[in-house]
């Protein structure tokens, strides 16, 4: 019983904190739009990242909290399919836009002699198309997911062997379940690898740039962190948060797919891991962008 209340508190806290953080960042960009300020090309990616995070939080955190409070059968089969589908789409777009953000950042900071330099002028023109393509791919990849989910009260049409908290997953074919888990995890693993490679390239570029600047003029060094250092720190924080949260989330999802009847602890822990990055990423963006931080905490003045 105690573990149940702990799970309720953690899921509810994650949901509330994540939603507030997402709204704060969105309001910041809305203020830019209303005042006519010119946005960077990557700001469009950030806005879609925040929307995807909000969708993932709303469709996972709220129903999971209600289920942890003991509310039963509040979603029918169609509701379960829709909520799970929207969560998967939001989760996928969150991963994809984070990967896109890393790619466009490394193109931005690359030197003229870098292998990324050829894309420097073309990349800003394709930001909107890249984000739209990310949404379309996530919608198509996850369209099979609702086929295996139903309401907890509807056990007549499929064999239920997975308790997913507020809904149930069906099917008793282990091979099919394993293939489904691998298919759904493949885009995540692909984005993980791509973002690690791109981010490591960016860190190397910034490190070489810092060494050249120090070599040219050591007398102008300031004790404050340089923009390159702040960019490097933001990359490392975002990549570390992304890799750790989604690696654990994928592992828990694979375990749930392979087990016949996962217990409530595994279900709640999987829910916590799945909304970990959507909860933390707005605050990572705040810490990396001084203008966002000043806007979101202006009430303290």
Swiss-Prot record:
Residues 27-48, 110-126, 207-234, 286-301 are cytoplasmic. It comes from the Eukaryota. It is a multi-pass membrane protein. It is found in: Cell membrane. Disulfide bonds: none annotated. Glycans are attached at residues 154, 157. The chain crosses the membrane at residues 6-26, 49-69, 89-109, 127-147, 186-206, 235-255, 265-285. The keyword Kinase does not apply. Keywords: Cell membrane, G-protein coupled receptor, Glycoprotein, Membrane, Pheromone response, Receptor, Transducer, Transmembrane, Transmembrane helix. Its main location: membrane. GO terms for biological process: response to pheromone; sensory perception of chemical stimulus. Residues 1-5, 70-88, 148-185, 256-264 are extracellular. Changing residue 58 to L: In allele VN1R4*4. GO terms for cellular component: plasma membrane. One of its GO terms (molecular function) is pheromone receptor activity. Pfam families: V1R. Belongs to the G-protein coupled receptor 1 family. The chimpanzee and gorilla orthologous proteins do not exist, their genes are pseudogenes. Putative pheromone receptor. This is Vomeronasal type-1 receptor 4. The lineage of its organism: Eukaryota, Metazoa, Chordata, Craniata, Vertebrata. The gene is VN1R4.
């Amino acid at each position: 019983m105690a573990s149940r209340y702990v799970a309720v508190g953690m899921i509810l806290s994650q949901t509330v904190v994540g939603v507030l953080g997402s709204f704060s960042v969105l309001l910041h960009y809305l203020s830019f739009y209303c005042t006519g300020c010119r946005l960077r090309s990557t700001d469009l990616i950030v806005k879609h990242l925040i929307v995807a995070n909000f969708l993932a939080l709303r469709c996972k955190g709220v129903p999971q909290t209600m289920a942890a409070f003991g509310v039963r059968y509040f979603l029918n089969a169609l509701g379960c399919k829709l909520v799970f589908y929207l969560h998967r789409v939001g989760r996928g777009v969150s991963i994809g836009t984070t990967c896109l953000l890393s790619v466009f950042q490394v193109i931005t900071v690359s030197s003229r002699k870098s292998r990324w330099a050829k894309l420097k002028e073309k990349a800003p023109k394709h930001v909107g198309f890249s984000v739209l393509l990310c949404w379309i791919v996530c919608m198509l990849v996850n369209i099979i997911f609702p086929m295996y989910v139903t309401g907890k009260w509807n056990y007549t049409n499929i064999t239920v062997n997975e308790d997913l908290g507020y809904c149930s997953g069906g099917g008793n074919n282990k091979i099919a379940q394993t293939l489904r888990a691998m298919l759904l995890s493949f885009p995540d693993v692909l984005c993980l690898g791509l973002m690690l490679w791109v981010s490591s390239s960016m860190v190397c570029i910034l490190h070489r740039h810092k060494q050249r600047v120090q070599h040219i003029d050591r007398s102008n060094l300031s004790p404050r962190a340089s923009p390159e250092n702040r960019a490097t720190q933001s990359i490392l924080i975002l990549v570390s948060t992304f890799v750790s949260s989604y690696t654990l989330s994928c592992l828990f999802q694979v375990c749930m797919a392979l087990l016949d009847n996962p217990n409530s602890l595994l279900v709640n822990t999987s829910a916590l891991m799945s909304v970990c990055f959507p909860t933390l990423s707005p605050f990572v963006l705040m810490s990396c962008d001084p203008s966002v931080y000043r806007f979101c905490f202006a009430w303290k003045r």
